[in-house]
Amino acid sequence: MIKLRLKRYGKKREVSYRIVAINSSSRRDGRPLEELGFYNPRTDETRLNVPGIVKRLKEGAQPTETVRSILQKAQVFEQVNA
């Protein structure tokens, strides 16, 4: 099963995340199938590859709760249902 989840990177206490499509049995920081965005919780900065995310969601990828809330803020699910 493919999941959309966060991949941690950055320095200690200055963490950032990449939103990735990855096999659900892979490690948190394992090799992703595709990088789909960026999220920095310190500045609340978010950059998303919306066409790539919509494609993965239509293929059946399941977002984690955190990624789901990020995508809802960006109103990505409206584009999936359209």
Swiss-Prot record:
UniProt GO BP: translation
Disulfide bonds: none
A molecular function GO annotation: structural constituent of ribosome
Keywords (A to Z) from UniProt: Ribonucleoprotein, Ribosomal protein
PROSITE patterns to which the protein is assigned, alphabetical: RIBOSOMAL_S16
GO cellular component: cytoplasm; small ribosomal subunit
Keyword Ribosomal protein: yes
Pfam families assigned: Ribosomal_S16
Family of this protein: Belongs to the bacterial ribosomal protein bS16 family.
HAMAP family associated with the record: Ribosomal_bS16 (MF_00385)
Name of this protein: Small ribosomal subunit protein bS16
Record lineage: Bacteria, Bacillati, Cyanobacteriota, Cyanophyceae, Oscillatoriophycideae
